[in-house]
């Protein structure tokens, strides 16, 4: 039986066509991105294809023809989340636009370390960590775990022992993790739904087993490494400022800066003739860059920002993937670099999984 909507000029107008599965699957992403403005149609279509591709068995079984409800606005006011690295970050982003990411990657990552220090370290931790960095040590931020992406399967575990913790470490794919330095290591702790983070100082880090992992990226600038071993850490070396979700807040704070850097790098590659941007790709790049800029300039943090930023990283990932698989990127090294950044600070599957888990179907 056909349905019709209103009468127009004496003739019934067909009802709007029902959404297909790809469009329905994309709603947990699109609803979050719409807070930044109207999406270009090409980007929306790209994200619909990606969402359908990323449906796992459980998601597909649970999928219905019902649309997802738009997320409700938070009843809590955003919290100020100011740090002292904004001006430096903006300066480096301008240099990336002119010269590409490779020559500015290390100083850009150092601003991330300073953001983490200023937002989530106690005053005593901050003073000691800054002194450590100022004396020539670099920070290794170790999140990816040999046990996989799910916290419950992590092999890196912090076990209470005496008046501190025994930290059993099995981390993979850490930037420069094979080199000496200090580290912030994310670990599973018994009974917690969030990972905990611990400061590991240079003399402790030097005792761990470290190995190279794969070829370097970004013109030899980025080398990954794996880390294993055990260290004892004091209670004072556990990150507590910011609450149990401190790591989530940190990633939500720095991800938009990373997305801005990636979009600036895409623009630079285009200027160098190493990447082609058609009208749809240009519109998608501009939307993502503008959205990321808007997020970095708010200076606040709200619970819903976690999902807004995950959607932004998802969009960035899918644009980079699209550029590579469509043949728009000329060189193998550039292709590999861009795909690597789709895995950094949130893969598409991880972003989509969390966005979908937070979404709810419309109730009849």
What annotation goes with each model-predicted range?
Residues 1-108, 277-280, 295-303, 361-364:
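Amphipathic, small/basic residue-rich leader segments at the start of a protein or domain
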Residues 2-14, 19, 23, 320-364:
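Glycine-rich phosphate/cofactor-binding loops in nucleotide/flavin-utilizing enzymes
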Residues 60-63, 113, 133-145:
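A short, Trp-centered hydrophobic/proline-enriched beta-strand micro-motif
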Residues 138-159:
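A gly/ser-rich beta-alpha-beta helix-loop segment of oxidoreductase catalytic cores
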Residues 170-207:
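A short core secondary-structure module
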Residues 203-237:
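Flexible, small-/acidic-enriched active-site or ligand-binding loops
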Residues 225-260, 267-280, 291-296:
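A glycine-rich, basic-preceded beta-loop-alpha segment at the flavin cofactor/substrate interface
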Residues 293-329:
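C-terminal hydrophobic structural anchor segments
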């Amino acid at each position: 039986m056909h349905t019709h909507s209103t009468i127009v000029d004496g003739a019934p107008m067909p009802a709007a066509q029902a959404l297909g599965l790809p469009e329905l699957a994309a709603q947990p992403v699109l609803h979050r991105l719409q807070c930044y403005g109207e999406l270009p149609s090409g980007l929306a279509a790209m994200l619909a294809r990606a969402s359908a591709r990323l449906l796992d068995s459980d998601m597909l079984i649970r999928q219905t023809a019902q649309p997802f409800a738009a997320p409700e606005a938070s009843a809590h006011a955003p919290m100020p989340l100011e740090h002292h690295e904004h001006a430096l970050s903006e300066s480096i982003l301008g240099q990336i636009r002119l010269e590409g990411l490779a020559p500015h990657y290390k100083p850009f990552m150092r601003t991330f370390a300073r953001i983490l220090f200023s937002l989530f370290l106690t005053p005593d931790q901050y003073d000691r960590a800054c002194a450590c960095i100022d004396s020539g040590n670099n920070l290794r931020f170790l999140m990816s775990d040999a046990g996989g992406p799910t916290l419950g399967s992590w092999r890196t575990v912090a076990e209470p022992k005496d008046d501190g913790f025994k930290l059993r470490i099995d981390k993979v794919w850490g930037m420069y993790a094979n080199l000496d330095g200090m580290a912030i290591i994310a670990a599973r702790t018994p009974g917690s739904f969030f990972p905990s983070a611990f400061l590991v100082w240079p003399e402790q880090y030097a005792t761990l087993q470290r190995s190279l992992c794969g070829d370097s990226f970004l013109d030899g600038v980025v080398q990954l490494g794996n880390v294993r071993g055990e260290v004892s850490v004091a209670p004072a070396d556990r990150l507590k400022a910011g609450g149990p979700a401190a790591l989530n807040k940190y990633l939500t704070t720095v991800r938009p800066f990373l997305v801005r850097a990636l979009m600036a790098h895409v623009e630079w590659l285009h200027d160098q003739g190493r990447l082609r941007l058609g009208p749809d790709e240009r519109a998608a790049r501009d939307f993502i860059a503008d959205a990321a800029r808007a997020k970095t300039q708010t200076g606040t943090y709200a619970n819903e920002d976690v999902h807004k930023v995950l959607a932004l990283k998802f969009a960035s990932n899918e644009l980079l993937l699209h550029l590579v698989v469509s043949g728009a990127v000329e060189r193998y090294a550039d292709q590999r670099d861009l795909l690597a950044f789709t895995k950094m600070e949130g893969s598409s599957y991880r972003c989509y999984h969390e966005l979908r888990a937070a979404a709810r179907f419309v109730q009849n």
